[in-house]
């Protein structure tokens, strides 16, 4: 069989605004009017082509599937504004009537594409023993030449134990299946053009009266060496059904090792910045390990033609830790100074900051004065300042007193539902 699916999402936005010279919005703006227009278009196209073949020979079932998938995301925008038009009734319909020295014009275009193809082979014997082997090749235009493509193989096997003769007489058992799988997955999720350095033109500047345009570096510095983040996952699970599946459960134990973690990293301020903001760069920054358990239990409490009542409980526990980083060193403030440090042996996006012990009080002025905010001991603490714990005991509160405070990753989650 052959199937082709084409889907698209499209959004159009347009905003027109006029603020008269005497309006509240223009108070303190030299009594001039403001006219502006902004419009944008966003589109997403997905085209999948799938061909499949299935064949049964006695107790043996074979299947093969091949597919291609193409996506394109596109965003365009344009905006223009001016100040000082003398006829309010023009509103935003005649931007050329504004003072030419006030013109601000901007536009943007962002586009990226992905292309994938995959092969999958299935085999089943009596629906009791099952094997699936597949491979997927993905390409992403956001990555640089030589790093755009990656391959993701996988293999999965299952054994429906409840179909074996030695369990046929266990009436309470409706289903029992053991599953084992291994596979690779990837992540190329960087911003469009994230591997390239660029410039942003500025025309709304003090030099505009003289017809000058200036440029600043983009916040993100290009890195052509960025490649796919790769994850290897082992999963061991079983499905069980009891009493004609009135009670069923799914349990999975997994371990995922990820290499070449793809994250934006805030660079040292010594390297400069853009618009008073430190530069950032996408990097394959290290490796992590995740392992955990997921359990889902479902019960059919009432099931008749007039009423049905199901209950579901899910529970998941996960341990995550960074196993390696660039140069083998922690990266403090990888994305922000407090909430996104990368610490070996800790989860991703850890909190690394001072321990807050409250506020220095008036009756603690003498004690507060023993602690200093700088290495030269010229600025001591005083009542009203935040009391930070001095971990190294040198009476100087500095970066050496920051410590691990936790992470954004929960140790466990659960959910209950009744329908």
Regions found by a protein language model. Name each.
Residues 79, 283, 300-414:
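Conserved small-residue
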Residues 418:
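Conserved small/polar residues in nucleotide/adenosyl-binding loops
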Residues 1-19, 29-346:
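Extracellular/periplasmic, surface-exposed regions of secreted and cell-surface proteins
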